[in-house]
Amino acid sequence: MLAACMGMTLLAGCDSEQQKTFNEAVKDLEQGSYEYALDEFTQSVNNGISLAVSYRGIGICQMRLGNYEDAISAFTSALSSDKVSKTMAKDLYLYRATARLQAGLLDDAMADCQTLAQKYEMDADCWFLSGKVALAMDGYDEASSDFEQAYGEDSCYDRAIQIYETYLEKDMEADGTRYLEAALSSEAKDTDDMCDRGRIYCYMEDYGNAKTELTNASSKGSTEAVLRLGMVYGAQ
């Protein structure tokens, strides 16, 4: 009986350590410590702890470290795991499509985007990614339609900048500039908005208005605005 109790205590201790490793992995991922998180999530997979979440964590770490093929493999393993909710599956398809895009596997990335469109409710992130993949495949009309859907659902400054930068990478700056102009039609609500407006004016090489926005933000205590002001002066 004593031996059995000791065995159960040791097993409980092992379970506790394994859960601690998993919790540390989640924490390290949130903090951007990708190499530590990768090692810990790998241990969690070996320990059979929250397999879908652990594989997802491995995939994100590998993607952030530039190891796109390994990231794709991890996201695929996560999708094949038991007890994957519909919400998590949608998230995993988004991540895998992104990794496939980064790896240059455009047909595979588009296949994931099509799965998202067929099986899940499309949101701004889905539409944006689908547009980005379409543009990489020179599907200009499809990309334009997807970006319009994305901005229609999330007309924030960051989204406008994302779309602009995607077009800029394809030397199609004019197509992206209209999103910057649309974003500027709204009023800034806080210092973050002022910083974003400053960034947009910089993209448009309107440094006078960029200074105005960033100066206003810095006067309200935004350290980001101070840094960006220095960049504006350096760009002139």
Regions found by a protein language model. Name each.
Residues 19-20, 53, 60, 87-91, ...:
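Start-of-helix register in tetratricopeptide repeats
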Residues 30-31, 64, 102-103, 136-137, ...:
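Register position in tetratricopeptide repeats
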Residues 49, 83, 87, 121, ...:
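Short coil turns that delineate tetratricopeptide repeat
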Residues 57, 64, 88-95, 129, ...:
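Canonical tetratricopeptide repeat
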